[in-house]
Each structure stands twice: as C-alpha cells, then as structure tokens.
Amino acid sequence: MTDNSDPKPLFSAPFVSSIMRVEDDWIDYNGHLNMAYYHVLFDRAVDEVYALIGVGADYMQARGQTMFTAEAHTRYLRELHAGDQVRVTFQLLGHDDKRLHYFQELHHAAEGFLSATCEVMSLHVDLAAKKTALFPPDVAHRLSLMRASHARLPRPDAAGRRISMPQKA
C-alpha cells in the first residue's frame, strides 16, 4: 500500500497533477483532442489524488474497496492538440462519510490557459457488498486535512452549474 504517512502533499491547495501529454491517437477528425480523452486526463489526475488520500489501486487490492464516479459535469472551453502538455488542478469542495465532491481544471502547462473543467461526485464502494461504504478512519482523516486546506480556496465560479437553454422571450 502507498505510504501516506507524510501529509504535506495533502496541503497543496489546490492539488496540482504531474504534467501529462496529449497523445497523437487522442486527436479526432476535427484536429483537436477528442472529448472522451479530456476525461482520461481528469481521471489520471484524480488517480494521483486518490493515491495521496490512500484510496488508490493498491487500496482496492488490499481492502476490497474503491472509488466510483457517480456524476460528472464537464465544460469544454478551449481546444488542445497533439503533443500539448497539460496539468490538472483538483479542489476538494466537500466530503461526507461515503462521498467526495470535487472540482478539476485542465490547464495547458506552458501557456496556462484553462481548457476544460470537470465537477464530480464520487462514491466510496465496498466491492464485495456492491454498495457504498464508510471511509475507514485513516482515509477520513486525510480527507479532513485536505478539505481544511482546500476550504481556504475560493469556490470555483463554475461549481454547481447545470446545463440549460433559456427560452427566448
């Protein structure tokens, strides 16, 4: 299991992922990053966060519990192209005994522009019982540390948005 005894990285507010590269195979016939691969980048970034809080791949193997995404709202704001280097920020907006609510931003690493956002609700799941489960105390503690750090950040303007098409008068 990952050694999470040093909580220092949890205090990064927001968490910033490692740099990732837009792969050539991810480009669609419009010449830019296909919408599905934005989620690959967001998912890889959240895997880094999950390792920090102790619910990564090794956690699933050791404890038979994992995280499932229950809902996601993605906004595509600016195109990315093959070879672009990107990074993702992660802000924990809230959590309870079984759920995480977080907001991610995908930025071009060199130019800094915001390319996409993704707001997510994730569930902690016991794979044997096939239902949600309480976070164990060690994970709950790390989540509390992260949330305390992230609570100092302003809430993203786009958090809580919904899709709508207002009717013209």
Where are these regions (language model features)?
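HotDog/MaoC-like acyl-thioester-processing domains
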Residues: M1-S18, L80-Q85, L92-A169
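A positional/architectural concept
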Residues: F15-H32, A36, V40-D43, R63
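Residue-level recognition of the GNAT/N-acetyltransferase active site
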Residues: E23, L77, H108
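A broad, structural micro-motif
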Residues: L33, M67-T69, S115
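Hydrophobic beta-strand-centered segment that forms part of the acyl-chain substrate-binding groove
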Residues: V49-L100
